[in-house]
């Protein structure tokens, strides 16, 4: 559990936007309570945990959740890229219709066929004054620019968009 927590922290510490911090216990509780609706998979190198991925299965979706990565090994062993392929493998195996990879690291996700989808965000405070401030602040929040890769031929893309 400590190794998982350290890997989670490596990713968390690099994140530009943080809503809250999870404990390693959270992942194990999710697995225990959600059973097959939650996946938690470890990546090992010489019996040492060097990465983990988690995700939720629901209503024909696989929602990629948090990951943890030992960045010292990521470049040489392409840990994160392997995680993306594993999400795809699990989705095919479980016959899910869509995968949500989340809103970070968009360029590498586009190499496996992911593309950005605009999301609606509803935030409301109980008091009026903070609501006005939130509206102003969130008007400035824009996705980071990235180089969108195209993993499919044009014809295949058109079929995906249907």
Each PLM stretch: what is its role?
Residues 1-75, 156-162:
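A conserved beta-strand-loop-helix scaffold within acyl/acetyltransferase catalytic domains
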Residues 6-9, 70, 87-88, 132, ...:
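Generic signal for short, ordered secondary-structure residues
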Residues 7, 23-30, 83-88, 104-108:
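Short, hydrophobic/aromatic alpha-helical segments in well-folded domains
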Residues 45, 94-162:
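Active-site/acyl-donor-binding loops of N-acyltransferases
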Residues 63, 80-81, 137:
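Short, flexible segments with low predicted structural confidence
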Residues 74-89, 101:
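Conserved acetyl-CoA-binding loop-helix of GNAT-fold acetyltransferases
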